[in-house]
């Protein structure tokens, strides 16, 4: 009986260990036209008992020339570098800031040779720095692209869910590999009245080349 119990405990421990390491995030995006109260919504869940046990808080700030922000990899806490602070940053709690801008993500990985390793902006830092610097979803997309292309990308392929009080967007991005800095990316607006979801798969499969507004 003891042998069986030990085997079951070891099996459970192995299962839990593999579950923590696996990519198991889910985002559900609801536009205001599809919600009963007229609100845009984004949910962010991960199948892990170790994730999202706390809400990250950063107060609003006013900065002067020369002030720097430290960048640590979100998953590991590894120090990656510093970037200059803008003149002002916004308060954020969890994955929302004071302007009701929301950014969440799921990791799809992508081709391993495109994984970014020559920059300092990992996917978590892109999320939280964008929340500190942007008021709207469109501004957040621009901030993310500018940060990744300026300071380099340090993660694998990601799908970001980005929403404000008016619009909901999905953004897929991936690095350019070890020899190039920056990201390849595409973003699409979720039409009002629709619901969208993604779970560790690149979400955007087709997109128009002549419709930058959507």
Where are each of the predicted segments found?
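Intrinsically disordered or highly flexible coil/loop and linker segments, enriched in small
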Residues: 2, 17, 153-157
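Positively charged n-region of N-terminal signal peptides that target proteins for export
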Residues: 1-7
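Sec/Tat signal peptide C-region and signal peptidase I cleavage site
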Residues: 18-24
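A contiguous strand-loop segment
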Residues: 25-123, 143-214
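Second-shell loop/turn segments in exported
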Residues: 115-116, 125-134
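Bacterial N-terminal signal peptides
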Residues: 7-18
């Amino acid at each position: 009986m003891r042998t069986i119990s030990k085997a079951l405990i070891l099996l459970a421990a192995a299962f839990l260990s593999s579950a923590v390491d696996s990519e198991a995030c889910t985002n559900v995006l609801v536009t205001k036209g599809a919600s009963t109260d007229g609100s845009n919504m984004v949910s962010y869940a991960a199948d892990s008992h170790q994730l999202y046990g706390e809400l990250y808080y950063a107060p609003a700030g006013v900065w002067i020339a020369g002030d720097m922000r430290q960048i640590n990899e979100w998953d590991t806490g590894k120090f990656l570098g510093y970037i200059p602070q803008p003149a002002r940053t916004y308060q954020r709690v969890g994955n929302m800031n004071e302007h009701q801008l929301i950014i969440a993500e799921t990791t799809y990985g992508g081709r391993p040779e495109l994984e970014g390793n020559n920059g300092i902006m990992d996917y978590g830092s892109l999320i939280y720095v964008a929340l500190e610097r942007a008021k709207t979803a469109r501004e957040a997309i621009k901030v993310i692209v500018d940060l990744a292309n300026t300071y380099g990308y340090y993660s694998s392929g990601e799908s970001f869910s980005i929403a404000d009080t008016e619009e909901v967007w999905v953004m897929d991005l991936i690095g350019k590999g070890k020899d190039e800095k920056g990201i390849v990316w595409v973003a699409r607006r979720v039409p009002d009245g629709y619901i969208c979801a993604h779970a560790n798969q690149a979400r955007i499969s087709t997109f128009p080349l002549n419709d930058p507004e959507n």
